[in-house]
Design a protein with these regions (language model features):
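Alpha-helical transmembrane segments of multi-pass membrane proteins predominantly involved
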Residues: 1-225
């Protein structure tokens, strides 16, 4: 029996459409490259980190164009928790372009000798990755992970100027507000899961439609949170 189990495990193959998540993979590769180069390169070559970040965000936009041009039907991945459809592609393209423009507009200030902080690129790219995850999330857990991944780097970016009192104050306030918001969102998700017993959005919708739970005060409270 043990041998048969081992054989079945060996035969099990997980098929993943890597092209569908190529933008996310490119952003991850850019994040790793940016933080590695910032650690390894001397100060006079730190501008390479900015070039890699700008180029990576631009390359991540290319698969979006091809996917949108050749779109036929939604691509559902990871047991239904991740979806690639036209709406998510439009939002992903928008987020990537905004990040790309942000890099272009801020690169001179970030690279100035007056106040250089190389983690700027790492944090902004990490926030972009979280935004991409949110746009394709199809269940509560994936959406919450994406929200946290997108918002947590912003706490640090708001306090980017460590020597500035206003920057530190803004970072602390943003952090406290973010923690409170995350707690309320997670509590709302837990109520919704407790009522329906489902994580996937479509399953939650079907459960609410097929029952009288959509009139429940708990469901209303979870929607508000």
């Amino acid at each position: 029996s043990n041998r048969s189990c081992r054989k079945s495990v060996r035969r099990l193959k997980i098929s993943i459409n890597y092209f569908a998540i190529s933008s996310e993979l490119i952003v991850i590769l850019t994040i790793v490259s940016a933080i590695s180069l910032d650690l390894l390169l001397p100060r006079k070559l730190k501008y390479i980190v900015a070039l890699v970040s700008i180029l990576g965000s631009l390359i991540a936009f290319v698969p979006i164009i091809f996917q949108y041009a050749n779109y036929s039907s939604p691509e559902i991945l990871f047991e239904g928790s991740y979806v690639i459809d036209k709406f998510s592609l439009i939002l992903k393209g928008l987020f990537i372009l905004v990040t790309y423009l942000t890099f272009l507009l801020s690169v001179n200030f970030v690279e100035s000798d007056e106040y250089y902080q190389g983690e700027y690129y790492f944090l902004l790219l990490s926030s972009l990755l979280g935004a991409l995850v949110v746009t394709s999330s199809r269940d509560l857990l994936t959406m919450f992970i994406g929200i946290e991944l997108a918002s947590t780097p912003m706490f640090l970016l708001s306090g980017w100027k460590k020597g500035d009192q206003k920057s530190n104050e803004g970072s602390i306030k943003f952090f406290l507000l973010g923690v409170l918001s995350a707690s309320l969102i997670l509590y709302g998700f837990s109520l919704l899961y407790g009522v329906t017993g489902k994580l996937v959005f479509s399953d939650i919708a079907n459960t609410l439609i097929q029952s009288d739970l959509n009139q429940s005060p708990v469901t209303l409270l979870s929607a508000i949170l």
